[in-house]
Amino acid sequence: YIIVLGAQVRKDGPSPVLKYRLDKAVEYLNENPDTVCIVSGGQGSNEPWSEAEGMARYLQEKGIDTARILPEDKSQTTEQNITNSKKLMKEGASVGIVTNNFHVFRALQIAKKYGLSDVCGIAADSTPKYLPNNMLREFFAEMKWLL
């Protein structure tokens, strides 16, 4: 399995952060044709539909077979992404977490906390001009999670 962690979707498609994640997922899925992809993310107040639905549409448009895509459309946080996605997987399955490079460290910590022992990070790029802001936000999210 791979789990693509959600980020904002818009009427015109995924946000830049999410597009990086989805493009990395497409690359991985094309290289690993037996892998099932869980797209994980609920609907925020500023989103036209759930992140999972938007991600599934994008992957389908890029040629990924619908049978390989499992939507998880309730999550609002990274912890919920992991715990809700885990319920869709076979016990003891190996999993890759697809997220942006600045988010991999915390996502893997959370995954291990919730019992995903055979887990690895699949790092997508991020927009360089936003990287300082993203790193700062991630630092505070990490501190909050640790406390």
Residue map of PLM features:
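A structural signal for short, hydrophobic/glycine-enriched beta-strand patches
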Residues: Y1-L136
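A transmembrane-helix-recognition feature enriched in membrane-embedded lipid enzymes
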Residues: L131-L147
